[in-house]
Amino acid sequence: MARYWPEPAHTHGTPERTGILLVNLGTPAAPTAAAVRPYLKEFLSDPRVVEIPRAIWWPILNGVILNLRPKKSAEKYAAIWSDAGSPLKVHTERQAKLLAGYLGHAGVTSVVVDWAMRYGAPSISDILGRMKAEGCSRILVVPLYPQYAASTTASVIDEVAGCLTRWRNLPEIRYVRNFHDHPGYVGALARSVRDHWAKHGEPDQLVMSFHGIPKRSLDLGDPYHCECHVTARLLAAKLDLPPERWQLTFQSRFGKAEWLKPYTQPTLEALGRKGTGRVDVICPGFASDCLETLEEIALECRTAFLGAGGKAFHYIPCLNERHDWIAALTDIVRSRIGDWLEAPVPAAELLAATAQRARTAGAER
């Protein structure tokens, strides 16, 4: 096998373009055990996600988890699947299209905006290859994780770097590391909450539920826990909420190890037992609604809270395609590629002259 993938044919006199690659976690191709199994295998084989020695983890993964979990996970996906497909995939694709439109409206036209999934399809490798074929010599990678974590953002960066080891002609690469405290992002979160409250009234308690990670990751220096707290504090301040009316929790614990606390579902059950009238839950760590928000929070946690004695439960959707969120995303992107945009685009006459010189020198294209 060749060490490097073949380079696409180059046409002299073609202007350089900038690629914007949005990346989210991923999704199976269908809500079936057969489709979930390879997706879970790819996800749980990532050493950034599971930091257990391979000799110990492989028998557990292949002998136990991949034989038991796909069917259960498929049932959960089926509960939130739409006619358009996986909600995460649908929202991410729409966000990419909207971002391209917002950039174009702002006069940024020499860009290619696309999207990929860290696990599943479309893969990072395939979309990077497509960007190269479209003439992108500069690429900004935007992991759609507001808070940085080694298991999410760093995994995306690992995958991009791994793909580029197979390229001969490398592009200039930049990454968005996080945007947990970006004013536009926090402002969009606050407005989404206020919009919900304007229609349904305010709750007794607002719970901000973030995806959890093992506590060991925090102990080893992962900044995720701190960035979640920053986001929660800024959001509470935007909403003018006193400390007794909101709290931060962590969801989606996997395995038996201790994860970041407090855990979301036990917290909601405790609120229910206390007779809390109404709880609203928002998930500020997710840019799009997905399995963890629509099934785990909106269905499972709702049942847990009401079953424990709570009176009313509201799930506040993720930002998805909200105008203020796409505007914030546009600002995040423009702030990272500003100097790229300042580079003058050669006039058509200059490009034609470049192409002619290349052909005179013997180039075929």
Swiss-Prot record:
The organism's taxonomic lineage, starting at the top: Bacteria, Pseudomonadati, Pseudomonadota, Betaproteobacteria, Rhodocyclales
Pathway in which the depicted protein is active: Porphyrin-containing compound metabolism; protoheme biosynthesis; protoheme from protoporphyrin-IX: step 1/1
Main location, first listed in the record: cytoplasm
KW Secreted (keyword) present: no
Name recorded for this polypeptide: Ferrochelatase
Keyword Cytoplasm: yes
Enzyme Commission no: 4.98.1.1
UniProt-listed InterPro entries: Ferrochelatase, Ferrochelatase_AS, Ferrochelatase_C, Ferrochelatase_N
Cellular component terms (Gene Ontology): cytoplasm
General function of this protein: Catalyzes the ferrous insertion into protoporphyrin IX.
CDD domains: Ferrochelatase_C, Ferrochelatase_N
GO molecular function terms noted in the UniProt entry: ferrochelatase activity; metal ion binding
GO biological process, one term: heme biosynthetic process
Tree of life domain: Bacteria
